[in-house]
């Protein structure tokens, strides 16, 4: 499973959204209905899945699906 596929699966599991909704340009808050707690849990799930730490400054820049995929891919 690719980084993109894993990130999308985490997003679907954490936010309870469908694969069709998880588009690269989808905003977690505006398009996928996430709140601040959802975003925190999403970051924690990605950290656990990929064995990396996402610092708070970087986490605040992860606003869209593509941001998360690009960030994690850059850490691999």
Swiss-Prot record:
Q: Supply the PROSITE patterns for this chain.
A: CARRIER, PHOSPHOPANTETHEINE
Q: Which GO terms describe its biological process?
A: lipid A biosynthetic process
Q: Which keywords, in A-to-Z order, does the entry hold?
A: Cytoplasm, Fatty acid biosynthesis, Fatty acid metabolism, Lipid biosynthesis, Lipid metabolism, Phosphopantetheine, Phosphoprotein
Has UniProt tagged this entry with the keyword Transcription? no
Keyword check for Ribonucleoprotein: no
Which locations, inside or outside the cell, does it occupy?
Cytoplasm
Q: Which GO terms describe its molecular function?
A: acyl binding; acyl carrier activity
Which Pfam families does this entry report, sorted A to Z? Answer: PP-binding
PTM note says: 4'-phosphopantetheine is transferred from CoA to a specific serine of apo-ACP by AcpS. This modification is essential for activity because fatty acids are bound in thioester linkage to the sulfhydryl of the prosthetic group.
Its pathway is: Lipid metabolism; fatty acid biosynthesis
Q: Which residues form the Carrier domain?
A: 1-76
Q: Which residues carry this modification: O-(pantetheine 4'-phosphoryl)serine?
A: 36
What is a single cellular component term in the Gene Ontology annotation? membrane
Q: What does this protein do?
A: Carrier of the growing fatty acid chain in fatty acid biosynthesis.
UniProt record similarity statement: Belongs to the acyl carrier protein (ACP) family.
UniProt protein name: Acyl carrier protein
Gene that encodes it: acpP
């Amino acid at each position: 499973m690719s980084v993109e596929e894993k990130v999308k699966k985490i997003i679907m599991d954490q936010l309870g959204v469908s694969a069709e909704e998880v588009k690269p340009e989808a905003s977690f808050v505006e398009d996928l209905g996430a709140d601040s707690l959802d975003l925190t849990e999403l970051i924690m799930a990605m950290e656990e899945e990929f064995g990396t730490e996402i610092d708070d400054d970087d986490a605040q820049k992860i606003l869209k699906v593509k941001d998360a995929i690009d960030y994690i891919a850059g850490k691999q």
